[in-house]
Amino acid sequence: MDRGMILDIPAWVCRSPRGRVATGINSYEEAVQGTYINNDYFMSNRNGNCKFLNVLQGENHAEADDWYSRMKKYCDPKQYDMPFEGWAMGGQNMCDIHLILRRLVELRHDGLLEKGLHDWMHFLGTSKLEWATLLTDIQRAVRKYHNENFTISFDCASPFLASANGQIYIQTEITDREKWVYRMVPSVDDKKYATDTRRFGDAVLQDKVFESFTESPISRRIEIKDICIYAPGDLNKIGKEGRTSWDSFSYAIQMGHNVWSHLNAVQEANRQYDQGIVPKMLVQETFDRVYFKDVVEAIFATSDKGEALAIIEDFSKFWIQIIGTRGAIGKKTVNASAMFSNLFEEEVDEADNHHQDDSGLDDTKLDELEQAE
């Protein structure tokens, strides 16, 4: 393994009934202390074969700042002979561009974004297509002005959640000054296709199952009967006739198609962005036309920390329109969320913290698929 994350305990688990049962964590402070224990174990037992990413958590700006101030030592070569080699952004750090930019400036001036030491930053659960271009802008700016090796990566479960929920990617929609999406729709599931030898893409378009369909290398090589396996009267592997025409491999094939489609969408989004096609959320046209990439360039072009932070604050209204995966942004996370957390105890399900671009996806379906195997 080249890189991996340490075993953090996210701040949100204390507000989740299932999270509390699974971890025994009942407060933010307990999550911090538990992460200390795990970080210390990783630090004491590592052999250097894997570069570890220090995970930053926190559900609002106040918690995120506190978490960073307490956990940043694990990446500090002045404190450890073999410090962690990069960062992973969780909680509010993964979806709030205001917080992300401020954290990057602090990392730079704390000496914790250095070439050869802290070359990698990973964003957890990042599913919005616009963020593929936004993170590219940040990576380019950091490489240009500070660390030429700096690399950003991100993950999301959308392709797998889509399949588990019976959905398939059919097209990518990239239009200038509009919302960018990879379109998911309910996939074909009909026992009448169990002996149909037409190619999958041909069948779904000829029969108007989908209005459009962008092929993948996988979909080009399958027939529709490879997805709709069971005919009327066929028994499944537990000896019963089910309602679906799919077997477990039907899900696997479509997951492969969805993964390719998602990766292709990310690549195409960056290609179009470099040609001047811009998503609505990354340009501010209320008064003067302001592009996200130009503001990011200005933030990292200056070597003065105070000036960089001032630029970030000057564009605080711009950041509010840039919506992250979880949707909580701007002043609500700086003020209202922090105050609410201080005054009330709220119970949430952890699924809410892995909210995908398609809000209808149910992440428990993946568990059901695994248990069915």
Functional labels for PLM-detected ranges:
Residues 24, 79, 111, 116, ...:
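Short, flexible coil/linker elements and helix-boundary hinge sites characteristic
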Residues 26, 38-39, 45-49, 54, ...:
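Detector for Asparagine
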Residues 1-6, 39-49, 76-82, 353-373:
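Intrinsic structural disorder
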Residues 13-19, 189-373:
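C-terminal extensions of enzymes
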Residues 1-61:
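Active-site beta->alpha loop and helix N-cap motifs at the rims of alpha/beta catalytic domains
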Residues 28-31, 35, 64-71, 100, ...:
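Generic structural signal of hydrophobic/aromatic residues within well-ordered alpha-helices
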Residues 47-217:
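Glycine-rich phosphate/ribose-binding loops and adjacent secondary-structure elements
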